[in-house]
């Protein structure tokens, strides 16, 4: 039997609840069809709310602190680390990538075989990129078996929406209307794909705060203005060697945006979660480790994959690489953090996975670094340097992460710290120690 082709689609900043489920208002028949003809993991956790760290985990099966990308500042992927492109190159696959240039800058696409693997960060599907990709699939005869990684930046803030989708029927926000627009483009792409012989993986790198809320007093929408979008474009054109200037522009945008938001609404009657969504920024504010930023979609569709199945168990971004390799009967590297999800896909699976999470480097304070763990029931966060800082959330009782309960759960904090130590130092996890035990001291 011929080896299947592999199409990996990463939609930057796509949240799990805006891909499938009752909280979405976008129109997504293509994504819906992929789910109907495959598997949807509805509780997939990203390693970090940053493109570089997250895609690094996806392509290596390793947490950021183990593949060279983790740290208090952005660093390149360790070139000695085995990654998905290297493995598939060695197993007879032709590997292609179309990803924003930021991925290439940090070594994420260096091992793909096509020389045109990167594009300008602000070249969008609807300004020519989409047609370029479709032309490749229409006219080029990719050498089979092939692996193609496509990373779409159109949902990344600020969203610049094509006018043809700026209509309420495509979603209540610019963000969701863009999801509809991307879905429409995906339908065109899939016409060129032999889905009977192609494994399709659709996922995201991280989530996003969407500053749009339905309240008793009406809709609050604080999405990016056209002025802010133009400032981002200017900042993007500044050379990398002028980083301090780029950072100054970023902080100026944040400051002006915060003032504008504060002037528009009265925050006194907003909940902790509502204030976070409206006023915080994934790229600037706090530790950036809440679920809006870390829960991502994961869809697998294609040969040998069960159909119309939704898996509620928590899985991790690092599990994607070993799962792809297992579908191809290729042994994954022995020392990775991820685990093969095929057993979970094919039968009931009761083992609880633990996800390691970490904060991206901070624009304002590069020494600020947080790490944590997440299970299906709890999330624990702590800082690495300085005075100890803890957050603990009961995700079953408090899914919006509004009440920090670490004060009354000292024993759980100790268990969580032990688990973090075991993960970061690659020790065997103590199976007899359950993070979920609610024992108070």
Language-model features: locations:
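Catalytic domains that recognize anionic headgroups
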Residues: 1-441
């Amino acid at each position: 039997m011929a080896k299947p082709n592999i199409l990996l689609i990463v939609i930057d900043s796509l949240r799990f609840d805006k891909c499938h489920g009752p909280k979405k208002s976008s129109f997504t028949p293509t994504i819906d069809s992929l789910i109907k003809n495959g598997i949807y993991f509805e509780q997939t956790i990203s390693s970090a709310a940053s493109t570089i760290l997250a895609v690094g985990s996806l392509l290596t099966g390793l947490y950021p602190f183990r593949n060279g990308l983790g740290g208090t500042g952005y660093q390149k992927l360790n070139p000695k680390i085995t990654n998905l492109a290297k493995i598939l190159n060695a197993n007879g696959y032709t590997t292609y990538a179309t990803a924003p240039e930021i991925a290439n800058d940090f070594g994420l696409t260096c091992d793909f075989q096509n020389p045109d693997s990167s594009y300008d960060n602000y070249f969008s599907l609807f300004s020519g990129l989409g047609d370029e990709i479709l032309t490749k699939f229409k006219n080029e005869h990719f050498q089979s078996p092939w692996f193609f990684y496509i990373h779409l930046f159109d949902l990344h803030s600020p969203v610049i929406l094509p006018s043809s989708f700026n209509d309420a029927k495509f979603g209540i926000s610019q963000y969701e209307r863009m999801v509809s627009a991307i879905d429409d483009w995906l339908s065109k792409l899939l016409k060129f794909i032999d889905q009977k012989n192609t494994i399709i993986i659709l996922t995201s790198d991280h989530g996003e705060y969407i500053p749009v809320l339905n309240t008793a007093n009406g809709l609050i929408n604080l999405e990016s203005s056209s002025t802010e979008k133009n400032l981002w474009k200017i900042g993007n054109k500044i050379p990398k060697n002028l980083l301090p200037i780029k950072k100054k522009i970023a902080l100026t945008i944040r400051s002006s945006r915060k003032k504008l938001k504060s002037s528009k609404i009265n925050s006194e009657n907003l909940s902790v979660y509502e204030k976070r969504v409206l006023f915080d920024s994934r790229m600037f504010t706090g530790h950036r480790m809440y679920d809006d930023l870390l829960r991502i979609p994961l869809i697998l569709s294609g040969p040998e994959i069960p159909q119309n199945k939704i898996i509620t168990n928590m899985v991790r971004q690092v599990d994607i690489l070993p799962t792809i390799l297992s579908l191809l009967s290729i042994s994954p590297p022995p020392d990775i953090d991820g685990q093969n999800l095929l057993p979970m896909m094919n039968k009931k699976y009761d083992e609880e996975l633990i996800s390691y999470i970490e904060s991206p480097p901070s624009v304002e304070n590069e020494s600020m670094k947080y790490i944590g763990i997440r299970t299906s029931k709890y999330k624990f966060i702590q800082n690495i340097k300085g005075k100890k800082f803890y957050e603990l959330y009961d995700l079953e009782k408090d899914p919006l992460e509004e009440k920090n309960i670490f004060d009354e759960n000292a024993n759980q904090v100790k268990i969580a710290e032990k688990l973090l130590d075991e993960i970061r130092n690659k020790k065997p996890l103590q199976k007899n120690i359950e993070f979920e035990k609610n024992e108070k001291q």
